[in-house]
Design a protein with these regions (language model features):
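Nucleotidyltransferase catalytic core that binds NTPs
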Residues: 1-154
Length: 154
């Protein structure tokens, strides 16, 4: 059974902190064994579905990593990949202890639906600890272009 490490998130927008986690995943799990899963989160603003699909294609091509958009519960995506013959490992990126507390709580919800889930937490490098998609969106709302240095050019 082949291992597939899945890095899920809304990635709205995908930034250099996310890229740092993807780089770590490739070192740990190996090229060809990782996937980015972009979840459509109803509580987070998304422009439109076609734009999201186009961005995911560009991201996949740029990183040379499969990117899949899903609009189901995360455990359902994991079960789908397991049914395709993969041993799935869920990868969660962390910036700090607050993220760990949040992710631990989210994992409890996921385990209410799927008990046997493998999770790896990867901490980003210190230089990326302050970067978040929500902070980038806030910067951009005040002055478009002000957060460009944090974004991955897709």
């Amino acid at each position: 059974m082949k291992t597939l490490a899945i890095y899920p998130g809304s990635f709205n927008p995908f930034h250099i902190g996310h890229l740092n986690i993807v780089d770590k995943m490739e070192k740990i799990f190996g090229y060809g064994n990782i996937m980015i899963a972009i979840g459509v989160n109803p509580s987070k603003a998304v422009t439109d579905q076609s734009e999201l699909l186009e961005k995911s294609k560009k991201l996949s091509q740029m990183l040379d990593v499969p990117v899949e958009v899903y609009n189901t519960f995360l455990h359902e995506l994991i079960e789908k990949k397991e049914s395709e013959g993969y041993n799935v490992i869920l990868v969660r990126g962390l910036r700090n202890g607050d993220d760990l507390n949040y992710e631990d709580n989210q994992l409890k919800y996921i385990k209410d639906f799927k008990k046997d889930i493998n999770v790896v937490f990867l901490r980003c490098d210190e230089e990326f600890e302050h970067i978040s998609s929500s902070a980038i969106r806030q910067l951009e709302s005040f002055r478009p272009g002000s957060a460009d240095k944090y974004l991955v050019k897709i």
